[in-house]
Amino acid sequence: MKKKKLLIDVNSIVPYYVSGKVNGIGRTTLELLQALADIDNLPFEIELYSQNMKGIGGRNTGLHFECSHFYLPHREKWNKILTKFPIREWFTGYDIMHIPHNFEYVHCPEKCIVTLHDALFIHIREKAFSHEKMKEIVPPFINQCKHIITCSEYSKRDIVETMKVDPQKISVIYWGVKHEIFFPMQVSKEILVNELPFPLRNTGYFLSVSCNNERKRTNVLVESYLQYSECASPVNDLVLVWSNPPEELTEKISYSKVKDHIHFLSNISDKQLSLLYNGATALFFPSMFEGFGLPLLEGMACGTPIVTCRNSSLDEIGGEVVFYLSDPIDKSIIEMLKMFDTDSVDCRQKVEAGIKRASLFTWERTAEQTVEVYNSCLTDSIRKIC
């Protein structure tokens, strides 16, 4: 009997092979693909699907899956055209398609599994991510699709409540950690100086792994550090993996007395990121909303003390092994900076518990649970052209 075919849309990983940069969704999609490739004797066939004019897609992964590529622009206009006719269905002959990036224009949503990472666009409008448009198109789409995967119990509840989706239609599958990269290690100053592109002082540093989204509140962290420096001389520098900080913030830093203590980094490899986690006095992640919170998990796996917020999925992932900020957030950050700066906090128990907690999250487990969803959906699917 011929195996059924699962088609995975891999368009979210294309930027990685173009520029070496990828967002959180692209990164987790790539990790899932690599973990799926390590599973022997899958009861179905996997094929990777991509669409762009450069010819970049599944073949670039080097994985053993079959690959299909459409030489069409991956733009809304063209994707809407593809919904009019069963072109993907004819071309690939898939039984079920997995869309791991929240939404896609498709001809037959009833044959789709969608990974909806969160319902952020319902609560917070970020123009750069077309959240107004997503609020309009995503809810009807996911109500039509065959099944939904999301990455936290919080996100599941939020999707059910805000988009009126049947909870039986949603599977929670946590993301994982690459434990072969993110693990506790002894990191000397010499190693950090040789591996990292910033001038490290003789003291330690606080770390932030974030981006320019306002909800991440990375700007609040920087402002709090500047405010703290007005009444104390920080022992720890502030290192931010943040490629595009706003000009008004960098200008404000340039006039401060701690301008040489604040470092912005970009294009960091996973190996360098692991070193940063391991060398940090603490990781600060003051986000106001997350569907998961991967930096928390990576930091825990490296034995880094974590400071974050008790909101959205963050306390679900952090549990009782992290330090939580309170409102007002800026004052709470300053208090935490002071506590770690003056060595007045004992974090050994939380660090040890964090390493143990992070060990429960693996990409192998993520892939195995995803395969269970694939199997369930393929078992009751009827191969037909919509």
Please tell me what each predicted stretch does.
Residues M1-C386:
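Carbohydrate transferase catalytic cores enriched for Leloir-type hexosyltransferases
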